[in-house]
Amino acid sequence: MFSSSLKLKTNPLMDNKIHRSSSDRDFRGSTISSVKCSLNNSEDLIVKVRERVKGKVEISPSAYDTAWVAMVPERDYSGQKPRFPECLDWIVENQNADGSWGVQSSSMLKHSLSCTLACLLPLRKWNVASPQLLRNGVEFIRSSSSAATDKNQISPIGFDIVFPMMIQYANDLNLELLLNQDLVNILFQNREAQLTRNKNLEYVAEGLGSSIDWNKVLMHQRSNGSLFNSPATTAAALIHRHDKKCLEYLNSLLSIYKTWVPTIHPMDVYARLCLVDHLQGLGVDRFVHPEIEVVLQETFRLWQQKDDKIFTDATCRAMAFRLLRMQGYHVTPDELGGYVDEESFFATVSFESSGTDTVLELYKASQVRLPEDDDTLEKLHDWTSKFLKQKLQSKTILDQQLERKVEFNLKNYHGILDAVKHRRNFDLYDIDHRRILKTAYRCPTVYNEDILLLTAQDLMTRQVQNQKELQIMERWLEDCRLDKVSGRNAVLVSYFLNANNFPDPRLSEARLAYAKTVTLITFLDDFFDHHGSREDSLLIMELINKWTEPLTVSYPSDEVEILYSALHATITDTAEKVYAVQGRCIKSLIIELWMEVLTAMLGEMDSCNADTPPDFDEYMAFAPKSLGCSLSILPSLHLMGETISEEMVTSLECFELDKHVSIAIRLLNDQQTFERERKERTTNSVTLLMDADQISEEEAVSRIQKLIEHHTKELLKLVVQKEGSVLPRKCKDIFWNTIKVGYCLYRFSDEFTSPQQMKEDMKLLFHDPVLKTTP
């Protein structure tokens, strides 16, 4: 498979005291011992992860938001007493040793400054703190104040607007901060620039004070009484305008969290979607599939109701769209129509949703396009991809983890192979991860030790299994004497590709059958193209068609004998394994599929030698079949633990799946190799279009790209559709994984010819330790 006319080189080989724990901080250093202790308790880990999916969403306290709630006055006492004194108690009890509040991190000093100044304000306003507590806080702000204008510091949303205003509040309260006046001037200049540049600033209205019409701000009030689900903004509104719903919202928070509030509430829907996304991205979703389905069903119900838990947050909306569509739920891109261009996006979304992480989610949503869609997702893809590329080029993504995610997704989205994605996501998974809104917060529901341990175990199990199976493949190669045949030894590459198609470690037989088939296709493709005569090629086809016993044949050459004997033995072995699990013989099906592939290879051979090349339609009638997609996939489907009937394999659905994946990969191949193949006088769809229609190379490549996109959309539609489908979804996913392989190999270069990235990915999967010992 993926082998026609290619030259394969030689194989290369917390935030705060309440939520802080030593196991969180020092986890990476103790990971190895933790995993070793858990190796025999995987079922316990699965139960814990299931509880994470079903249980309450956990979130860390926000010193910043708790401080704003603490500033709300009690109306019954003419505003001379705090409405929420318990928040004041929490502030007093949770100052860090260095005088700050909030996360202590050298890259998040702006966060610390914002939290610390916010906490000093209610302490000063209500005069409840000891002088030393205030002095320590003021000293921290003074000593760290230079970070307030440091562009290399990660900035909370609205910092440049809110922090200067809090300085003004401090002055009004006669709280002397001892800040350099030049620095203060710069901060207020930056604030004015932000106010001029940005629209939709209601999310950070606490930084606008009396300059904003709070009645207009309250027009953004949500059904739960909050403003943007932000305790700080809601508290600020309550300070400026008494509103019963705002008060009820804050009361509800304190009934839940008792003495503090988070920076966002509620966030159940978003957190659960993030959790599902992470579990899928780490490859451990199969352990909690029923629980994930419950989450998606509830999300779809909210989607249909246009619930504000989804639709008031662009990030959540985009993620919900992608996850639901990829699982076959009927969602249309109309709901993303407000974000079709950059101008519309920034004019539509609130300040909280205007960051790079939101644009990345929109970019990923734009990739799940179906044939019936209008141009919404294409327009969305155009501007989000340009925006993210510009962010990478300008090096303005200060969050290194987010930067790596953007780079990984932007490089070749459809070419991200599952097993590679799982491993790279694991390397990025950090149980101390903090998302930045107005303040940094942790969500242990999404980032936790249970998921990390379960994934580590799974990846180590996979790696051990992969190494064993590679040894089996090498022995098979030697037993079949294929190492004696001229051509590309594609064992390592073939196995790597199918390991990505079947990442579940239990699917050993499916992986091996697939890998052996791809390896044989590669050898035979080289034989037909370069090392054998037409007569020898026809002989191999005749022997397969008649299913002749290898020992009864008089062979014209050792290579013909080795190739046919290997084919006969491998087909027999695969058929026997399928019979053992399915109770029916598919040998005739495998032979038929081999004849189809070899006939297509012969057609390629003849087209290269013909005086008149085939036209485009004639070429596309045989060239996609020479890749052997159905030959590689269909036998393997019988070894995946699903009951596969003959009717399934011969269904129109299966035919269409094979057609679209084969055509798309053939065109991806041709698009990348046409310049070389034109010099070699090898038939290629790009050159056929150029010659037949007398069009430029650029126009031909553009037409081919549109065809690739068409067949990719059609394939995805078949994979995700539920109604009328006869193949199990697990089986249809193999066709989708296969097109990912095509994008991986041919989207930007011919990786069979220049396999540098593939070398790195193979090393990562097969050899690099899953857990790295920290010094």
Curated annotation (Swiss-Prot):
GO BP terms: gibberellin biosynthetic process; miltiradiene biosynthetic process; terpenoid biosynthetic process
Pfam families linked to this entry: Terpene_synth, Terpene_synth_C
Top enzyme class: lyase
Gene Ontology CC annotations of this record: chloroplast
Sequence positions that bind Mg(2+) 1: 525, 529
Sequence motif DDXXD motif, residues: 525-529
Molecular-function GO terms, alphabetical: magnesium ion binding; terpene synthase activity
Cofactor(s) in the UniProt record: Mg(2+)
Binding residue positions for Mg(2+) 3: 669, 672, 677
Protein's cellular compartments: Plastid, Chloroplast
Tissue specificity field: Ubiquitous expression in roots, stems, leaves and flowers.
Listed InterPro entries: Isoprenoid_synthase_dom_sf (IPR008949), Terpene_synth_N (IPR001906), Terpene_synth_N_sf (IPR036965), Terpene_synthase-like (IPR050148), Terpene_synthase_metal-bd (IPR005630), Terpenoid_cyclase/PrenylTrfase (IPR008930)
Note: Abietane diterpenoids (e.g. miltiradiene, abietatriene and ferruginol) accumulate specifically in the periderm of roots. The ent-kaurene diterpenoid oridonin, main constituent of Isodon rubescens, accumulates in leaves.
Entry comment, domain topic: The Asp-Asp-Xaa-Xaa-Asp/Glu (DDXXD/E) motif is important for the catalytic activity, presumably through binding to Mg(2+).
Protein name: Isopimaradiene synthase
Species of origin: Isodon rubescens (Rabdosia rubescens)
Lineage, highest ranks first: Eukaryota, Viridiplantae, Streptophyta, Embryophyta, Tracheophyta
Gene: KSL6
